[in-house]
């Protein structure tokens, strides 16, 4: 659906994106993460032509974005809804009129506008707020208005630029559930830019980490978070303090393996002692995955590693 190849972007004398190559599949929720100033929001805005790119290619639904004229670009943006951290709704208009605005701009008839606005307000849980004004709403409700407005033209792609950054954790969860619902029920491809790791783990299928203008990590969320490397490991704060003596082994428990009593079985069957340094379970789109670090004596390393291989447990010496 979206093909990004060797994209570069320059502001003045500064290169902010370099050799960016990604493939975003139809129907998935794709996350773009990175530290502030990494260029992730700039990349997102290149997808719908809000920003120009200086090098490479961006094809959205088989259309090269930089080759589109103004009319073609307007049609592309019609197929790409967008929501922002700051909501961008008009305080002088009530909720109904805020959602109706794009439909009015595209000169839809009044009956269609009324039906569409009420349908979308129901979808986002604001059917009773049609006549309310933004000042009467919470931050989460304002973002729901923005989401409803972004869906008015029945887009094929929804771009989310730090859409939950201004919200409290509980409200963030409710907005993420709504985005998942939209992705599933309306079959809309979602591209999420965020610095919030919980957002990525909760709704994304795959992610790309932008660091130093380039993509430094790219793949399935659970794979990258279970075995993070480099900048991603720093971002998710997994730099751990480890014992200096013995051998430290990190175990990974994807899918059903996380439910097995591997550790107690290993201790019993091999008759070995070891220390558990730390462990945790995390949820990735409702799939529970775990990791654990154990410290063992050097002479037990071969037996334990053979046991882990036999049980098909992923592991690495760290």
Swiss-Prot record:
Catalytic activity: L-methionine(out) + ATP + H2O = L-methionine(in) + ADP + phosphate + H(+); D-methionine(out) + ATP + H2O = D-methionine(in) + ADP + phosphate + H(+)
Keywords from the UniProt entry: Amino-acid transport, ATP-binding, Cell membrane, Membrane, Nucleotide-binding, Translocase, Transport
This enzyme's EC code(s): 7.4.2.11
Subcellular location: Cell membrane
Residues of the ABC transporter domain: 2-237
Domain of life: Bacteria
GO molecular function, one term: ABC-type D-methionine transporter activity
Enzyme class name: translocase
Membrane-topology descriptor: Peripheral membrane protein
A GO CC annotation given for this chain: plasma membrane
Nucleotide-binding among keywords: yes
Amino acids binding ATP: 34-41
Coiled coil regions, renumbered to chain: none
Assembly, per entry: The complex is composed of two ATP-binding proteins (MetN), two transmembrane proteins (MetI) and a solute-binding protein (MetQ).
Family: Belongs to the ABC transporter superfamily. Methionine importer (TC 3.A.1.24) family.
Biological role: Part of the ABC transporter complex MetNIQ involved in methionine import. Responsible for energy coupling to the transport system.
PANTHER family: AMINO ACID IMPORT ATP-BINDING PROTEIN, METHIONINE IMPORT ATP-BINDING PROTEIN METN
Name under which the protein is recorded: Methionine import ATP-binding protein MetN
Species in which this protein is naturally found: Clostridium tetani (strain Massachusetts / E88)
């Amino acid at each position: 659906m979206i093909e990004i190849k060797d994209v570069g972007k320059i502001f003045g004398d500064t290169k902010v994106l370099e050799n960016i190559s990604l493939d975003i599949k139809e129907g998935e929720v794709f996350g773009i993460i990175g530290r502030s100033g990494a260029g992730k929001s700039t990349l997102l805005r290149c997808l719908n032509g809000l920003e120009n790119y200086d090098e490479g290619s961006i094809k959205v639904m088989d259309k090269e974005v930089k080759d589109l004229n103004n009319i073609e670009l307007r049609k592309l943006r019609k197929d790409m809804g967008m929501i922002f951290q700051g909501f961008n709704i008009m305080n002088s208009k009530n909720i109904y009129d805020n959602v109706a605005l794009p439909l009015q701009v595209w000169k839809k008839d009044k009956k269609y506008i009324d039906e569409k606005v009420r349908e979308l307000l129901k979808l986002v849980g604001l059917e009773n707020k049609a006549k309310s004004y933004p000042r009467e709403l919470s931050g989460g409700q304002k973002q729901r208005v923005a989401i409803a407005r972004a869906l008015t033209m029945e887009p094929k792609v929804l771009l989310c630029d730090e859409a939950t950054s201004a919200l409290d954790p509980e409200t963030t969860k409710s907005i993420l559930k709504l985005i998942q619902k939209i992705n599933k029920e309306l079959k809309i491809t979602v591209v999420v830019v965020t610095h919030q790791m919980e957002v990525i783990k909760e709704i994304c299928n795959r992610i790309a980490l932008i660091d130093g203008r380039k993509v430094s990590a790219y793949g399935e969320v659970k794979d990258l978070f279970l075995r993070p490397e480099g900048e991603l490991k720093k971002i998710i704060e997994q730099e751990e303090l480890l014992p200096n003596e013995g051998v430290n082994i990190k175990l990974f428990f994807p899918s059903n393996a996380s439910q097995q009593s591997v550790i107690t079985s290993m201790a019993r069957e091999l008759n070995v002692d070891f220390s558990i340094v730390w462990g945790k379970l995390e949820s990735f789109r409702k799939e529970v995955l775990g990791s654990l670090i154990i410290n063992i004596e050097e002479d037990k390393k071969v037996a334990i590693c053979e046991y882990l291989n036999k049980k098909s447990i992923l592991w690495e010496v760290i």
